[in-house]
Amino acid sequence: MFCKISRAPARMGSRIFTQSTLRSFSCAPVAANIDAKKVAMSNFEKNKFINYQRIKDNLEIVKKRLNRPLTYSEKILYGHLDDPVNQDIERGVSYLKLRPDRVACQDATAQMAILQFMSAGMPEVAVPVTVHCDHLIEAYEGGPIDLERANVTNKEVYDFLQTACAKYNIGFWRPGSGIIHQIVLENYAFPGGLLIGTDSHTPNAGGLGMVAIGVGGADAVDVMANLPWELKCPKVIGVKLTGQLKGWTSPKDVILKVAGILTVKGGTGAIVEYFGPGVESLSCTGMGTICNMGAEIGATTSIFPFNPRMSEYLRATNRSAIADYAEEFAPIIAADENAHYDQIIEIDLNTLEPHLNGPFTPDLATPISKFKEAVKKNDWPQELKVGLIGSCTNSSYEDMSRAASICQQAIDKGIKTKSLFTITPGSEQVRATLTRDGQLDTMRKAGGIVLANACGPCIGQWKRTDVKKGEKNSIVTSYNRNFTGRNDANPATHAFVTSPDIVTAMVFSGDMNFNPLTDTLKDKDGNDFKFEPPTGAGLPSKGYDPGSNTYVAPSSVNVKDVAIDPHSKRLQRLTPFKKWDGKDMKGLKILIKAKGKCTTDHISAAGPWLKYRGHLQNISNNYMIGAINAENGEANKLKDQLTGEYKTVPNVAIDYRDHGIRWVTLGEQNFGEGSSREHAALEPRYLGGAAVITKSFARIHETNLKKQGLLPLTFADPAAYDKISPFDTVDIDGLTTFAPGKPLTLVVHPADGSAEWSTKLNHTFNKDQIEWFKAGSALNHMANMHKQK
């Protein structure tokens, strides 16, 4: 059988694999006091040490309390509990109070995180924090030119971030350094650690055995301010890998297959933990790829258990001391025999095919053997316009080496790309190493364009000129997301996510029907030839070339203030939101009843809007402009109930707010899936929103809404969504007795004058989160607590 799924709770021992792995380390007996060793967390933070002793001590307490076997991810999470003695621990129910080891922020989300941290009045961050400049570089002409233009265009933001980093003791990675997740893997991730990052693909570090979780900026501020971080205790989905990858099948195909099985919401509230003998055929960066795209199934995070490939990668990236220490510590966090998984999926790597997922959603999985048929059946555009490789998901040395091996075959046959072909190295280190070893030159000779070490087209930073907006076309990428209009702001672009290998092979045909496993191309002499499977080393044989030094350590110079021009269009100091007035909410308008898929890209678009991520007033002009209005089936066209005119969503919201009228947004399933951007929660709060009421939420967005003092609520009866008219007026009752587990009531006053009716609204607020709501936001609550002290 290709794959096996166990839907019911199941038990499966993973001890055989973990024990054989541990034997391969020939590790020494575990020291009685692990903390006797002082091993630096990174080469940039010599005075910040890995705290394995805390994990060991916490686990001794937790295991006695729970008296059951623990999975690898559970051991890491519970090893970071703030209070292991009194913490309630029940999967899917409890809220864990955790102490992460570090925080990572990308430049688009760091602006708001730092602005919030500044409001908290703290002198410096309490844990190691880094900021990475990767989101604001637009891809257009090529790496150096695009980078130079970005440095000019974004100077105000970069100067703000660098100055703030110096003031608050934060590490700063300049533009051109690379993508945050590749930088973290190369320099900061370590087995057994707990990382939070203000980007949804933070789980990439799970490829190095770290629990790494994407969060909103307000969550990051908690940790930066030395407060425990709260996470609903996740369930654990086990994915057992057997067999071995070979030929055209790559690590990317593992997660593409898993996405097809679990869908975009199947991992919600769970950690996906990989294990089994098949893990041994994966490189460390390949494991990172799989964990990275776990965000597309809604998973809290994904992780692989510590294994020899991780040790090899740590040593290759100049972290031998961490590798030695992790090997010594490995037995403590190895998954226990008969550890319990809430669901188990089995995948045989021997029979796994390359996949292409899409269009318009990353969980529409099609094996390559059936893709030609799917193109015809669904009338997808057959011509391949552009192939793009790179992104935080697939931009490692191994990824690029395999792609280059395909390009070399094409060069040897005298052919060049028929589709536009772009290459994005994941980091300056990867770029420099690929340049030294010749792979980038090979890809250029084949017709490729090398872009800057940044996110680029993956997040919509792409000045595309080969098609007009609205023109139906197909692209293939090695990225992670393919929501409508995400890459190029063209809703008619059909984007398919696959491996760098398949992307590279397909650009030489220019045809979506081309299958490199079975089909041939014509060489320069008109003879048929077929590509051989790609080859590439997991690690460079000559070691990594670090390239240019793009890291800026926290300044020893005292920075007294972080200046923000009050007339700036890109940066704006925050004004605290008003606290709750102590009453139930009456006479609320329905701003928009959103129909169908509504991701954070629909709620708060990226691309050209990224430049306003530090200016709440300006970026609020993109609220819900991509969402489909259930009333008329159109985007960004709403009826203003005060004037009767049709306007943009933000303009209607502003009109209601300025007239003192609060409003709600209605949505359907998995509302807010995708990016961790907290702007999707800040904007409705700024514009006068009171609640977002849906059939279900994506994890990060639900938390972000709570953090900003909004009410994320779900229909107890999903059919109520269909019954409500967008022109009705609603009340939210029960807030005066707001309590965990106690539903609220939505009272609907129909616009047609018919009798009012009511429906129950569920919520997941705990006691502390209710205090956020009452204070007006989590940041307000933090400030209040600080004043009391």
UniProtKB/Swiss-Prot annotation:
Q: Which reaction does it catalyse?
A: citrate = D-threo-isocitrate
Q: Which cofactor does it need?
A: [4Fe-4S] cluster
- Domain of life, per UniProt, equals Eukaryota
Its GO biological process annotations read: tricarboxylic acid cycle
- The principal localisation class reads mitochondrion
Q: Does the keyword Iron-sulfur apply?
A: yes
Query: Where is this protein localized, as stated in its record?
Result: Mitochondrion
Q: In which pathway does it act?
A: Carbohydrate metabolism; tricarboxylic acid cycle; isocitrate from oxaloacetate: step 2/2
Bound cofactor: record note? Binds 1 [4Fe-4S] cluster per subunit.
Task: List the SUPFAM superfamilies.
Answer: Aconitase iron-sulfur domain (SSF53732), LeuD/IlvD-like (SSF52016)
Matches recorded under InterPro entries: Acnase/IPM_dHydase_lsu_aba_1/3 (IPR015931), Acoase/IPM_deHydtase_lsu_aba (IPR001030), Aconitase/3IPM_dehydase_swvl (IPR015928), Aconitase/IPM_isomerase (IPR050926), Aconitase_4Fe-4S_BS (IPR018136), Aconitase_4Fe-4S_dom (IPR036008), Aconitase_dom2 (IPR015932), Aconitase_mito-like (IPR006248)
Q: Where does [4Fe-4S] cluster bind?
A: 392, 455, 458
Query: Which UniProt keywords are given for this protein, alphabetically ordered?
Result: 4Fe-4S, Iron, Iron-sulfur, Lyase, Metal-binding, Mitochondrion, Transit peptide, Tricarboxylic acid cycle
Query: Does the keyword field hold Transmembrane helix?
Result: no
Q: Which CDD domains match?
A: AcnA_Mitochon_Swivel, AcnA_Mitochondrial
Annotated family: Belongs to the aconitase/IPM isomerase family.
How it assembles, according to the record, is:
Monomer.
- Chain's role: Catalyzes the isomerization of citrate to isocitrate via cis-aconitate, a step in the citric acid cycle.
Annotated protein name in UniProt: Aconitate hydratase, mitochondrial
